[in-house]
Amino acid sequence: MTDRTSVSATDRILIIDFGSQVTQLIARRVRESGVYSEIQPFNTVTAASIAAFAPKGVILSGGPASVTAADTPRAPIELFTMGLPVLGICYGQQTMVAQLGGRVEAPDHREFGRAFVEVTAGCALFDGVWTPGERDQVWMSHGDRVDAIPEGFSVVAVSEGAPYAAIADEARHFYGVQFHPEVVHTPKGAALLRNFTHGICGCGGDWTMAAFKDQAIARVREQVGSGRVICGLSGGVDSSVVAALIHEAIGEQLVCVLVDHGMMRQGETEQVVRVFRDRFNITLVHRDASELFLGKLDGVVDPEAKRKIIGATFIDVFDEEARKVGGADFLAQGTLYPDVIESVSFTGGPSVTIKSHHNVGGLPERMKMALVEPLRELFKDEVRDLGRELGLPDEMVGRHPFPGPGLAIRIPGQPLTREKLDILRRADAIYLEEIRNAGLYDVIWQAFAVLLPVRTVGVMGDARSYDFALALRAVTSTDGMTADYYPFDHTFLGRVANRIINEVKGVNRVVYDITSKPPGTIEWE
């Protein structure tokens, strides 16, 4: 949870999270309409905390629990007497109904996936979007449903599986929907949310990235004062935006350290040095530690072992370089909003680690520095917008996500060598060049090549070859949580494969990965 006074926005919406997998989408949709929103877990929200946050309205998210069971999550009962507009979504609708005297049941018939609602009456939530008698598509995902509504409410939409698909208490500005307006599968959902934030709550929609930039610069200056900040640059979007923002705030008080572990993409290190040292005139220490990293990784095949070795070695090198420049009072990190809110467990138990994340989490304690995290209220797409506001080049802020361990986890099932890294680096560059030439780079969430631990027989010229097979991966996504493979046409794939085989010595076979997430992950390791 972020500090409640961290963003100086007059108009703000509080989202109380009951554990839905798509709560972040609610926040994104609200912010897309120019209104700052913040997610707070149900078990931390009180009447006092709501008053301190001073929202213009409150949204109750969905969740996996059943209102009909004992000891399941509830909103603070005082919320409903504070005079604030409230919108309950799915579980949020159900708990509002139950807490206000209505009834929720667990019927035999459930609704999951696409459904259609029939609008039975008008209300402020539907203004300009739906009219009585209209039928439209929504996305449902519920087992329980409202069986009786509290006094003051009326039904405004129904569906086959939900007789109270949407309800309204216009006098108190309470609204509930059984469907999910935040997902793209509810085509008019964003318009409904905008009606709530702008029309019902009266938000002005003036939260912009330009305004955020000014506020963030002021906060950095206030926090740092005359202190010194050190920032680890990786070439990725997050660290680049952090460095540019802090430099605009405090100038020469910032020192950046670029630790080159030898596993960056082609030309990436040179671009980072050029942009930050030459264009922004930032003090930048560039350490080529590739020999050290590759030595530590010699013979290592296990992906988790790779990540841990790279993380630990990075900390050692970063610490060494920081001491050389005289140390610092603060460490800048590119923590994003999903990193903050994903740490909340709604079951009280640990979450399963699918892959450990490479970060500099061990540095603050070891180096006795306070953290500066100016991006901790932003989603990834907002970070890109902020980067553009700060004047970073599009080829940097629009860059596809790249893992901290770099190309090390794109050479699976085999020990790393410079030769393999060079083969992968050249093949990856050709692939991305062709994607850009086809005008597809900004359409695709992430694309990369993977050097497989397989050698295959081929014929090149009149001679037998026995070289590596290479996999190509490209996915579309909105947030990286789920993803689908990009459907390239065969002509494009043939052109890429032909170039790689002809231009990259050591590869004689190219395949395309058509696995979605889930069941696969985007990266191979």
UniProtKB/Swiss-Prot annotation:
SUPFAM superfamilies (UniProt xref): Adenine nucleotide alpha hydrolases-like, Class I glutamine amidotransferase-like, GMP synthetase C-terminal dimerisation domain
Binding site for ATP: 234-240
Domain Glutamine amidotransferase type-1: 12-206
Gene Ontology CC annotations of this record: cytosol
Gene Ontology molecular function: ATP binding; GMP synthase activity
Quaternary state and interactors: Homodimer.
The protein's name: GMP synthase [glutamine-hydrolyzing]
Naturally occurring in which organism (per UniProt): Rhodospirillum rubrum (strain ATCC 11170 / ATH 1.1.1 / DSM 467 / LMG 4362 / NCIMB 8255 / S1)
Gene that encodes the chain: guaA
